[in-house]
């Protein structure tokens, strides 16, 4: 089976993450001046500190924080068709769950059922799924 190069996939994902951040998390804004959006692709900007097996920082694709204080408000992970997998749910989505902020996982249109199954198998509860579809000039997001 043909699989695109990792560099190509990563380049596309960086653009999709940027488009999702601009469209769905345009903070700070007049309506929400106390929020700040940090995009961690291609370079980590703001981490989420988690405990468990030692304190460590995780870098979701998008992290929205309340300012001042940088308290997590929304944790967002954006996936490509290659990364909607059981391993991704276990190794990436599950650790991003926090009691402090909801976890949003954006998956390509057509991959929602698989993503839900993987999240359930990984014991992830309360995840909020969205689908994305590339369109000329940006990304269209659908909420579920």
Per-region residue spans from a language model:
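Active-site metal-binding core of divalent-cation-utilizing nuclease and nuclease-like domains
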Residues: 1-18, 22-74, 136-137, 143
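Catalytic cores of nucleic-acid endonucleases
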Residues: 57, 70-73, 79-129
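Residue-identity detector for threonine
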Residues: 37, 43, 49, 83-85, ...
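Charged, structured surface patches that assemble and position nucleic-acid processing machinery
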Residues: 123-140, 144
């Amino acid at each position: 089976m043909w699989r695109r190069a990792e560099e190509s996939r990563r380049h596309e994902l960086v653009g999709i993450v940027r488009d999702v951040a601009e469209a769905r998390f345009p903070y700070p804004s007049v309506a929400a001046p106390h929020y700040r959006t940090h995009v961690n692709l291609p370079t980590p900007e703001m981490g989420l500190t988690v405990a468990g097996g030692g304190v460590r920082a995780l870098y979701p694709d998008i992290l929205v924080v309340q300012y001042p204080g940088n308290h997590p408000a929304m944790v967002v992970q954006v996936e490509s068709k290659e990364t909607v997998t059981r391993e991704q749910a276990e190794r990436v989505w599950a650790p991003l769950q926090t009691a402090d902020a909801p976890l949003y996982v954006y998956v390509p249109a057509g991959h929602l059922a698989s993503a839900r199954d993987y999240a359930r198998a990984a014991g992830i509860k309360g995840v909020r799924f969205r689908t994305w579809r590339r369109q000329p000039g940006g990304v269209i997001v659908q909420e579920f």
